[in-house]
Design a protein with these regions (language model features):
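Short alpha-helical patches at coil-to-helix transitions and adjacent helical residues
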Residues: 1, 96-100, 149
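Glycine-rich phosphate/nucleotide-binding loop
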Residues: 31-132
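Glycine-rich phosphate/pyrophosphate-binding loop and the adjoining helix
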Residues: 125-166
Length: 166
C-alpha cells in the first residue's frame, strides 16, 4: 500500500546501511522460489507475510520449519508461522522446530540472551544432524530415525544439557 511504502521510506532514513528495495508481492513470491538468496530480511504487512511464509515453508519442505516474530518498537510476539493444525492435534506427530525456533528468537531479540538462543538453534540442528526426523520431513525407510514431537523435544533438551553452561 502507499501508506506502507511511505512508512518504510521514512524509517529507512534511520538505517542508512540497510538496502531497501520495494518489490510487489507477486514478484517477491517468484524470487523466493527462483533466487531465495537475494533476500536477507523481508518486511511486509501481515497478510503478505502469512502468504510468503507459507510459501517459504513449502520450499523448505514443511511449515514446521518456520518460526516467526512480529517485533515492534515496544512489544513483540513469537509464534510458529503455521496454524494450529487441528488435523494432527494430539497425535504427537507435529514438528516442534518452528515453536522452539520462535522461543530461540524471543530469547535473542526480546531478552538479549544471544548465547542461549544460539545454543537452542545448535541443539535442534544437532538432532537433525544425528539422523532424526519428524514425519513431516521424511518417509519411513528414508534412512532417518523417525521421531515424535515429544521425542524431538527430549532430544533437544539432552543436547542442551550436554553443552557447556553459558
Amino acid at each position: 500500500s502507499v501508506l506502507w511504502n511511505e512508512i518504510v521510506e521514512e524509517e529507512k532514513k534511520n538505517y542508512p546501511d540497510v538496502k531497501v528495495e520495494h518489490i510487489l508481492v507477486d514478484a517477491a513470491a517468484t524470487y523466493l522460489c527462483l533466487k531465495p538468496t537475494m533476500f536477507d530480511v523481508m518486511v511486509m504487512e501481515n497478510m503478505f507475510g502469512d502468504i510468503l511464509s507459507d510459501q517459504g515453508g513449502g520450499i523448505l519442505g514443511s511449515l514446521g520449519l518456520m518460526p516467526s516474530a512480529c517485533i515492534g518498537p515496544d512489544k513483540a510476539y513469537y509464534e510458529p508461522s503455521h496454524g494450529s493444525a487441528p488435523d494432527i492435534a494430539g497425535k504427537n506427530i507435529a514438528n516442534p522446530y518452528s515453536m522452539i525456533g520462535s522461543v530461540a528468537m524471543m530469547l535473542e531479540f526480546s531478552f538479549g540472551m544471544v548465547a542461549e538462543s544460539r545454543n537452542l538453534w545448535q541443539a535442534m540442528q544437532s538432532v537433525f544432524a544425528k539422523g532424526y526426523s519428524t514425519p513431516d520431513l521424511s518417509k519411513p525407510g528414508a534412512g532417518v530415525k523417525m521421531i515424535s514431537t515429544s521425542e524431538f523435544g527430549d532430544l533437544v533438551v539432552n543436547e542442551l544439557k550436554a553443552m557447556p553452561k553459558v
